[in-house]
Design a protein with these regions (language model features):
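A structural motif detector for short, solvent-exposed N-terminal "entry" segments of globular domains
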Residues: 182-224
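Extracellular glycan-recognition regions
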Residues: 1-183
Length: 224
């Protein structure tokens, strides 16, 4: 049936943080079928009121955009190119950085592109803390199995910028057969990777999330 699905893990990272992930949609996104990657969130219930930042993939436009959410109100901070326009099965990679001074920068790359394209940079320090990060999908009945997130990484080695190089937006106005695994940073302490997510599986199938710890240290998850 039509509805929403989400998954979260504890995460307090905000400053000097980089988020990277791949997305594959088996449909062209629309106002009724799109996804959000919550970079930060005050709540583990992504369908309710919360304070945080998220990247939206699709929606009214076939692009990737950065939003800030306060309670149940979302504000567009920066909007990227319409890289999914006319694409019935978009495959893309997204990278977001937030430095110590509050500058947010995000890049996108289609699977067919060799390098990331810098979309926008904007300063926003309205929300300084986080408790979770996660994935949130909104879908109609026929699209409920059409979302795949992969190669998810979070690291804390972002350099600090001094000034934005882009003008902020005015809010008023198939996975590869053998995908390349991004190289991990040398220091991966405290880093966890979402390796695979499966939800709304067949009637007799199991739903699961696979989390990979690339370090040699044990990591305790108090909640999932």
């Amino acid at each position: 049936d039509a509805g929403t699905a989400y998954i979260t893990i504890p995460s307090t990272s905000v400053k000097n943080t980089r988020w990277e992930f791949g997305v594959h949609l088996t449909f062209n996104p629309s106002a009724n079928n799109y996804a959000r990657f919550y970079l930060t969130s005050s709540s583990n219930i992504l369908s309710g009121n919360l304070n945080g930042y998220y990247i939206q993939i699709g929606g009214a436009k076939d692009n990737v955009a950065l939003y800030r959410q306060n309670g149940n109100q979302s504000k567009l901070l920066a909007s990227g190119r319409e890289l999914m326009k006319g694409n019935s099965s978009p495959k893309l990679y997204i990278k977001v950085e937030r430095d110590n001074n509050g500058y947010w920068t995000f890049w996108t790359r289609l699977e067919s592109e060799n390098e990331y394209v810098k979309e926008k940079q904007i300063k926003d320090t309205d929300i300084q803390t986080s408790r979770y990060c996660g994935i949130y999908c909104i879908y109609t009945k026929t699209r409920c199995k059409g979302f795949t997130f992969h190669h998810i990484q979070l690291s804390n080695d972002v350099e600090t910028n001094t000034s934005p190089d882009e003008t902020p937006d005015n809010p008023d106005t198939d996975l590869p057969d053998n995908p390349d695994t991004p190289e991990l940073p040398r220091d991966v302490r405290g880093m966890l990777l979402f390796n695979e997510i499966m939800y709304n599986n067949a009637t007799d199938g199991a739903e699961y999330v696979e989390i990979y710890n690339p370090t040699e240290q044990a990591v305790i998850l108090p909640a999932l």
